[in-house]
Amino acid sequence: MPASTAPQAPPAPPAQAQAQAPAQAQEAPAPQRSRGADTRALTQVLFGELKGLAPGTPEHDRVRAALIEANLPLVRYAAARFRSRNEPMEDVVQVGTIGLINAIDRFDPERGVQFPTFAMPTVVGEIKRYFRDNVRTVHVPRRLHELWVQVNSATEDLTTAFGRSPTTAEIAERLRITEEEVLSCIEAGRSYHATSLEAAQEGDGLPGLLDRLGYEDPALDGVEHRDLVRHLLVQLPEREQRILLLRYYSNLTQSQISAELGVSQMHVSRLLARSFQRLRSANRIDA
């Protein structure tokens, strides 16, 4: 009987093939751009298509619907800022989508502004109007209302005396109250109306209080808006640069920034508001 032969191993692949195999395995998942970059690229293409279509036509409606769908993450991002209001998030997203649609209908790609930068103020504005019209105001105790008048007066006097905004401790010492009472007064004013800044402007809030408190400027949300902040930083005084860095890169609240810098939260609010105005002017952000 012929001797049995052991099974032979398959021939080894050529050295070149062996060298290529790891490279091919590494290249299998092609590098993907970030989701945000993909959305911006798709949005740009869709606006290019939309420009050549007559409004009201089926094709125009199809492209417009695709734009809405592609940019819904922007609405959800904006809506998430209002989670503390205890409203159903689905309702807030629906309201924000109305703002998104309005922004799409008004957007002009030739202005050279990124669509998220243009749309965010409209989306957030629509959500704030919803809360203004549908959320009940919070009752502020009379004592806090009266205390605010004293805090406001003391702040003005100390600002004149020191040539700067006073700290919370300095206000408390002037009025012979605790720092906690000063902060309670400020927080009561913040919650007096669901849309703090709008309420004050419309004469609905505590006299002057909410004008002095900070507000979150929608133009600075997201990575695109941080890029705008970075561009603006070189134009700002050193203290405003630091406050913006703490707020939008370190993600500190206004209260935390005031503690970090040893100034009142009202002063932080004013500096942020001043920086926001410069940002809007420099970049022509449509609010």
Curated annotation (Swiss-Prot):
Stretches the record annotates as Disordered:
1-37
Any signal peptide, and if so, which residues?
Answer: none
Q: Name one GO molecular function term.
A: DNA binding
Question: Motif Polymerase core binding: which ranges?
Answer: 91-104
**What residue spans carry the Low complexity bias annotation?**
15-32
**Family of the protein in this entry:** Belongs to the sigma-70 factor family. SigB subfamily.
The identity of this protein, by name, is RNA polymerase sigma-F factor
What are the leading ranks of the lineage? Bacteria, Bacillati, Actinomycetota, Actinomycetes, Kitasatosporales
